[in-house]
Amino acid sequence: MINDIKQLHKRYRLLVHLSNNHVYAQIIDDLNNRTVLSVSTLTPQVKSKLSITCNKKAAELVGEYVAQQALNFGIRNVVFDRGRKLYHGKVEVLANSARSFGLKF
């Protein structure tokens, strides 16, 4: 069991946060305690494509963009961290979108 946990810490973590107005996704390197990249509905490339920033379409676009950016950084495998949110609705849409664009978790 301990070895499994250590293996997970060698991978990057995709953290998802939802507020009332925006969708956020970060890829975090826990070994070095730093955020590698961050994408949200406030990111200009994402915001320009949306009229509403807190729906499933916004979550899908954030998932797509975070996956593309991660692949540009050479990150393919991540651990999905949804916090206390249920794997439902916007969280599920973001995860499926990131998977469809090449992230593995």
Swiss-Prot record:
The keyword ATP-binding does not apply. InterPro entries: Ribosomal_uL18_bac-type, Ribosomal_uL18_bac/euk. GO terms for molecular function: 5S rRNA binding; structural constituent of ribosome. It comes from the Eukaryota. CDD domains: Ribosomal_L18_L5e. SUPFAM superfamilies: Translational machinery components. The keyword Isomerase does not apply. Coiled coil: none annotated. One of its GO terms (biological process) is translation. One of its GO terms (cellular component) is chloroplast. It holds the Pfam family Ribosomal_L18p. Keywords: Chloroplast, Plastid, Ribonucleoprotein, Ribosomal protein, RNA-binding, rRNA-binding. It is found in: Plastid, Chloroplast. Part of the 50S ribosomal subunit; contacts the 5S rRNA. Belongs to the universal ribosomal protein uL18 family. NCBIfam families: L18_bact. Binds 5S rRNA, forms part of the central protuberance of the 50S subunit. This is Large ribosomal subunit protein uL18c. It comes from Cyanidium caldarium (Red alga). The gene is rpl18.
